[in-house]
Each structure stands twice: as C-alpha cells, then as structure tokens.
C-alpha cells in the first residue's frame, strides 16, 4: 500500500510523475536490474547493450575497481584480487569461509566479530564492500537509463538467507547509496514475474537453481494473495558446483596435481563453465588443457552432477511434506536461475512434479523482473486494484533457552511474515532479580543442537518468590526476515531488547542439516527433552524442600519424619543425573507424598501467624 503523499504549501504534488524504483537480482554468478516502463517490466542494459552483469569485482593497484565482464575475464590472471561468487560469503564467519577454502582461491583475514576480509592490493575488503561495488554499478546503470535519482530498490535474496545474510545485503545496499524498499525472496519474485498473482489460483512450485544457492518454495495463490506454504533448499548448491564437478573431472582425466595454484583453478573453472553451457545444446563438447585433450559427453556430465540434482530433489520433497502437498497437486512449476537451462535439471523437475515446468521467461531475468514489479508498487506507482500482498515465511523456528538448557519455540518455522509473538516466562529461584534471554534458531529440542543468535539481560526484576514474576518476551520478525526480541517484567514495567544482528551467518548446508536432524532425531530429542524437564522439576522440588526444612523442620517435624524426608531427598539426588525420566518422576512423586503432611503444617502455621491478634470483625472486613 502506498503512503499518502502531502505536497508542500503552494507546490503541486505532480501526481503524473512516476517515482523511480528498480528491482535488483543480486546473484551469485550474475546480477541484473529491472524496472517498469510504459507498464512493462524490462531488464536495463548497460552501454554495450548487455543486461547481465557478472557478479565479479577486481581491485587494481592504482585504486580503480572493475566490476562485471572485465573483472571476470581477469579472474584467471589475477585471482587474488578478483572476487567471484561473493554472495556465498555474505553474512558468514571466518570459520565458515575456511570450510569453502578449496573453492575460494583468496587470502582471508579475520576482522572484528570473526568477520572474513579478503586481502587485496587495495587492502582488506569485506563481502559487504564487494557486494556494494556490484550494487553501485547497477544503481548507476538504472539512474542513467531512467534519467533520474532512484527512490529505492527491491533486492532479492534466497528464501533460505538467515538474519545475518539479510542484514549483510541491506548493509551492502546502504554502502552503494540505495534505499531498500524491501528484501524479497527470489522464488516469490519469480511468481510475480509470471503474473501468477492476476487471477490464478492454486499451488505453485518455484524451483530456483542459481549459481550458488538452491531454493524451492511452495506457494498458494488465492485472489492475488501469495502465501508461502513452505520453503526449502540448500545455501551451498548451484551452478558453481556443476562447474567444480567438471573441473575435478578434467583434473582427474588430465592427471593434474590436486594442489593447483589459484590461476590454474580459475582457468579450469572457466573451461568447465563453458563446457556446461555448451552441453545444454550439444550432445558432447571437446576440451583441451595444456597437452591434454578430451571430450565430455552430455551423458557423462549428467552422471557427474546427478548427486547435486538429487540434493535439490530431496529439498523439494521436504518442502512438499512441510506444506502438506502431494506432487500431483502442484498446478505449475516455475524454473528460475541460469542453472535450470541444464536439460537434466529440467527433466528431474518434470519427473518429480509430473508436469513440464514453465520456462517462457529468461530464467536469468525472471527474478529481477518480479522484483521490479514489486518495487513499482512499493514506490507508490501501483494502479488501483493492482496492489500485491506477499506473505513470506521464516525458514527456521525461533525461540529461547529455558531451564534445563531446553529450546522453547516462540515462532515455529514456516510462520507467515511479518509476525509478532509473545510468550510469558517466570523466575526459577527466590529473589531472582535478573534474567538472561538467550535467543535461538533451529528445530531441535536441546540448546546445544540449535544455533545461538543473541543474548541479552533483563535486570531490575523486583525480588519475589520463584514463579511469581511474569516476564513477557516478544519476538518480532519484519517482512525482510529481520528479528527483534524484547523482554518486559509486567509488574515493574522494566524492559530490555535486542536487534538480532549476528556477525556471521549459517555454515554451508546448516539450515538443511538442522531440518534433516530434526526429522531424524525427533524421537530421541523428545525423550531428551522429557528427561531435562523432569530433572529441572526434581531440582526445583529438592531446593524447595531443603529451604522448608531449614526454616520449619525443627519446629514442625519429629526426628523420624525429618529422617524419612531426608532419606527420600537423598534417593532422588541419586537418580537425578540418570538417563531415565520415569525413574526420576517416580522419586519426585515419592518425595512429594512424604512431604505432604509437612506442607500442610507449614500452611496452617502461616495462616495462624497471619491471623494472630486480630478480631473476627477485622477479618470479616
């Protein structure tokens, strides 16, 4: 919905002038910028007539920065100063990046908060700075083509990008001088590009295989409303991996050493990429590297990439299961990303969903076009009846740590965004005046199996008995998937909050691993959670009974009664660290039974003390 525009006194609001906004597909391999002109979405071309900008940045000794084709062409001769596929590094930590070492021929330095910096002749550069160079070129291209300054841009991101990766994308845009109208999930943008919002109803699958990431989204379309039923994918699967599969095959066939210098790696990857593209139209391609010559057939290529294609299909099946949808219920399959030009990929999607996928729009441009349509609406240019409602979801559950190091989910995964959820918690010990809020992301039951996002403290809680204080913790996730968490003690009104901005993102495949583990270990996790909960309950009971004995044991219990209680306490302590929740529960019940009479006497004594010295009419009043 457009904001109301109020003109300055004496000035015309000029309603006929369109506000200039663009959609940007910031891709792993290539990037594009698109806009709406005369009611039609189009990708904007550079001065050489090219729409695609290779996502390549080269830093030169004289201080200049090359972006695009020139940088990509120099990758083999200047690999250490030429950054490709920087999207893989966005929002990641230095430890995550080292896991990709063999695929990334750069020299890395560790910055603040474990941020990875790429060493170049112009000094260390962060992934955010590199991405900003790409966005800066796209912004200039758009402003030159449109003849004015942009009011903002919709930038697309993989549906599986977590908070750190999304925030890194926003930071890069800010460095490039762009106002981000919204971050839009790439699969959702593709659905917009195909016009599926106009009158179409049903369930659609968006199969998005780009250069470095794979996303599958299951969307329900109802009267122009997009609802994402489920998302899935792999944050480290794409066309780059196809290139590496071919390059490794060449190394093996040519008898090359596995320890190759960066320049050779770059050259082999360029050779592999050209072969991959040729095999989309030809049955075989001739290859040569140094003295070695060979031929790669399409059949052999498909065998090399079959494990990668299978990974994408596995994610598709998981997303269908999450959405509660059978493959035959899918009304349309939209193919997105340059890697979907590979015939084996198209066949695999057709076989899984039992229908031919939609490939009418250039798969390299479809995401940028969808983003441009959404940007035009958000900029206030939408015509009556053409507003678009996009409901995205969070890819993993969000929650916090409770006693016993348990994960309490506050916002389950696949919850429609934006969303705000609140849950009330209480103190564990008498007189507790502070609470540590530990924010987590993941699907498992125990804290150790989930990812830590942030920690903050709520201080100044009025001292009271355990369980009396009420602390409301509110999770808010905006339309871009960014999280804010606040905690408020309801009695005193004290409050603390944190914007979750972790310094790096998930490791390769970590989201997929989290989901996989949540299914595989569901039974064991529930048993472990039950054990922890029983241990927490037992510990709480032991502390309460011990405090009661110290306060009133001598006055209200006979020596035999006290001995019986202490014996049962000792028995409970003996099984407290054991593996059987049922055994602990039995001992808790026994201790409760043996202390029932003691609890009743303490209550009577408290009532007598409260009424002592008061007249009947005072009590009645």
UniProtKB/Swiss-Prot annotation:
Similarity comment: family membership: Belongs to the heat shock protein 70 family.
GO biological process terms held by the UniProt record: iron-sulfur cluster assembly
Xref: NCBIfam families: HscA, PRK05183.1
GO molecular function (one): ATP binding
Chain's role: Chaperone involved in the maturation of iron-sulfur cluster-containing proteins. Has a low intrinsic ATPase activity which is markedly stimulated by HscB.
Gene3D superfamilies reported in the protein's UniProt record: 1.20.1270.10, 3.30.420.40, Actin, Chain A, domain 4, Substrate Binding Domain Of DNAk, Chain A, domain 1
Record protein name field: Chaperone protein HscA homolog
Alphabetized InterPro entries for the sequence: ATPase_NBD, Heat_shock_70_CS, HscA_NBD, HSP70_C_sf, HSP70_peptide-bd_sf, Hsp_70_fam, ISC_FeS_clus_asmbl_HscA
Nucleotide-binding recorded as keyword: yes
Highest taxon above the source species: Bacteria
Keyword vocabulary terms for this entry: ATP-binding, Chaperone, Nucleotide-binding
Bilayer-crossing regions: none
């Amino acid at each position: 919905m457009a904001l109301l525009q109020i003109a300055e006194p004496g000035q015309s609001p000029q309603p006929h002038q369109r506000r200039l906004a663009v959609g940007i597909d910031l891709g792993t391999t290539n990037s594009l910028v698109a806009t709406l002109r005369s009611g039609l979405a189009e990708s904007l071309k550079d001065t050489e007539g090219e729409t695609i900008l290779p996502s390549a940045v080269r830093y030169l000794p004289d201080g200049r920065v090359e972006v695009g084709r020139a940088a990509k062409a120099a990758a083999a001769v200047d690999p250490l100063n030429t950054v490709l596929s920087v999207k893989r590094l966005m929002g990641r930590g230095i430890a995550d990046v080292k896991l990709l070492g063999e695929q990334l021929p750069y020299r890395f330095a560790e910055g603040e908060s474990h941020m990875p910096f790429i060493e170049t002749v112009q000094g260390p550069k962060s992934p955010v700075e590199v991405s900003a160079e790409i966005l800066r070129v796209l912004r200039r291209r758009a402003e030159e083509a449109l003849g004015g300054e942009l009011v903002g841009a919709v930038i697309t991101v993989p549906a599986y990008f977590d908070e750190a990766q999304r925030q890194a994308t926003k930071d890069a845009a800010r460095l490039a001088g762009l106002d981000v109208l919204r971050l839009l999930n790439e699969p959702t943008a593709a659905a917009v590009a195909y016009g599926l919002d106009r009158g179409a109803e049903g369930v659609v699958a968006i199969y998005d295989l780009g250069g470095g990431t794979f996303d599958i989204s299951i969307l329900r379309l109802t009267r122009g409303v997009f609802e994402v039923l489920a998302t899935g994918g792999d944050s480290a699967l794409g066309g780059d991996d196809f290139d590496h599969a071919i390059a490794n095959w060449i190394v093996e066939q040519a008898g090359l050493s596995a320890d190759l210098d960066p320049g050779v790696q770059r050259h082999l990857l360029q050779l592999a990429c050209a072969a991959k593209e040729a095999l989309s139209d030809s049955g075989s391609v001739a290859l040569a590297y140094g003295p070695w010559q060979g031929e790669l057939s399409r059949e052999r290529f498909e065998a090399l990439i079959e494990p990668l294609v299978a990974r994408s299909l596995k994610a598709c099946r998981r997303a269908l299961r999450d959405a509660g949808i059978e493959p035959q219920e899918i009304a349309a399959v939209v193919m997105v990303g340059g890697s979907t030009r590979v015939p084996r990929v198209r066949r695999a999607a057709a076989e899984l969903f039992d229908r031919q996928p939609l490939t009418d729009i250039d798969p390299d441009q479809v995401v940028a076009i969808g983003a441009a349509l959404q940007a035009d609406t958000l900029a206030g240019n939408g015509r009556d009846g053409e507003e678009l409602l996009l409901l995205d979801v969070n890819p993993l559950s969000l929650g916090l740590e409770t006693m016993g190091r348990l994960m309490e989910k506050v916002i389950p995964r696949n919850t429609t965004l934006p969303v705000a959820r609140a849950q009330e918690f209480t103190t564990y010990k008498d007189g507790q005046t502070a609470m540590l809020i530990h924010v987590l992301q993941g699907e498992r039951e125990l804290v150790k199996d989930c990812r830590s996002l942030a920690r903050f403290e709520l201080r100044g809680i009025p001292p009271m008995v355990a369980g009396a204080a009420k602390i409301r913790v509110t999770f808010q996730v905006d339309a871009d998937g960014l999280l804010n968490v606040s905690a408020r003690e309801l009695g005193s009104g004290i409050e603390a909050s944190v914007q979750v901005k972790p310094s790096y993102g998930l490791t390769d495949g970590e989201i997929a691993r989290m989901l996989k583990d949540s299914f595989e270990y569901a039974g064991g996790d529930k048993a472990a959670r039950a054990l922890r909960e029983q241990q927490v309950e037992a510990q709480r009971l032991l502390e309460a009974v011990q405090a009661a004995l110290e306060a009133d044991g001598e006055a209200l219990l006979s020596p035999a009664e006290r001995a019986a209680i202490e014996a049962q306490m000792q028995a409970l302590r003996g099984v407290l660290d054991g593996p059987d929740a049922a055994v602990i529960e039995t001992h808790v019940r026994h201790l409760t039974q043996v202390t029932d009479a003691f609890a009743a006497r303490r209550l009577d004594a408290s009532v007598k003390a409260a009424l002592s010295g008061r007249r009947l009419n005072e009590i009645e009043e």
